Amino acid sequence: MSEKFDYDLIIIGSGAAGMSAARAAAASKIRVAIIENELVGSKSDIYRVAQLSASDIANQYYEAKKFLQLSNNQDTLTYNYPSLFETIQKRVKKYILAKKKSFANFKIDLIHGDAHFISPYEVAVANKRYSAKRFLVCTGRSMDLGAISGIETTNYYLPEDIFMRVKKLPKIVLVVGAGKKGIETAEYLAKMGCKVIVTEKEDTILEGYDKEAIEVVTNKLVSGLKIKILTNTKVVAIQKDKNETVSSGRRVATVKVTMKRGADEKTVRVEAIVFAINNRPNVELGLENAGIKFSDQGIVVNDQLETSVSHIFAAGDVVANPIKQSVGYSTEKAAYEGTLAVNNILKRNKLTLTYRHFSTVLNTTPKSVTVGLTEKDCLSRGIKCKIVIVPEIETTHSLIASEKLGFLKLICDKDKKLLGATIVAKNADLAVMEIVAGMYGDLTLLEHASMPHINESFSDIVRIAAKNLM
């Protein structure tokens, strides 16, 4: 590539898409820089590390309490949250350090700050300009709270605050938004002993997920963790309120929250409010100066991740891509897009997008994992499909499992080719890998049904489902 540019490739954003792209590009011995305005690894990746670490701790605490009850032990189990918080912070710092080392290993320049396109070949960061032959935009998405009265003058939290910054958990919490982040946050708080209310403006939680998965997760949250879920409910105003004694028995500063459901209006007082709603693409970087087409859905790309400007590509959550499945996005998909974009930037055999083999995991207990198409995806695309649902209770594994709430939903087309699956189970993220491998290698239902499985393992459910679909 030409020496008249500072770099052969500038990547804007160091999330999953940006990091995978940087590694692929650096391995090709070209000059690469990443521009990042946050911590290395991007907020979404760092959030994921913090959330998984916190959930691991919450699960251990929750299971320990259940064990005491099972053994009729009357002891009260407590925790030292500052110590637990420090453990989470250590894991996050370890992750950030590993990302920084990877930059050094691949000889990637790291430029801190906000990038702004000046022209199709140049960006400004603070008072400096950087030019490149090619650009890859991986700026992700951010929370958009919209028009909520009092939002500017009232303290509130985002999910990342709960896992990464809050050193003392509130006792009564309202979580606004019942998507993946909202539900994971609500479950974590409830397992740590908080009273939790969840509001969702749609008529169901986890919109886009299979209805069977929603039913199991909802039952676990409501019956098991005593979380109150209010659907078709919109928060319209929040207000810092006076100190008062709340139902937890503590005298604290409260937040007055006004909600509407249809014509009915209701007010609640909580110790904290967490917003997990309305992600919007981060497109405020002068895209118009480079001639890049974008909308409120994100940057417009083709199926090779090329924007309206041939030398500029985009990948990850910032992309407005109609191919994405109804269960949203994942780090794995973003990383795949980043690598694919670099392949196409380097003019190799051009690759086109396909999400057939990718999975999305909801990190609750039990976990819900979706790979490929959902039933809703098939209906929206006019695909005739055959579906089988196998409850966990039909497996030998259920005889030794403490909970038997799970199931496998397997979907195939009229030619009995696997299209997708949803698994709800404690170890769903492990069990799904057989299906991912099978779809990737185009295994037939007969091959799945004939494959030797460990009889007492949950993964035997795949064999049972495949046999039932034949």
Predicted regions and their residues:
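A conserved FAD-binding loop/helix module that cradles the flavin
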Residues: 213, 315-377, 455-470
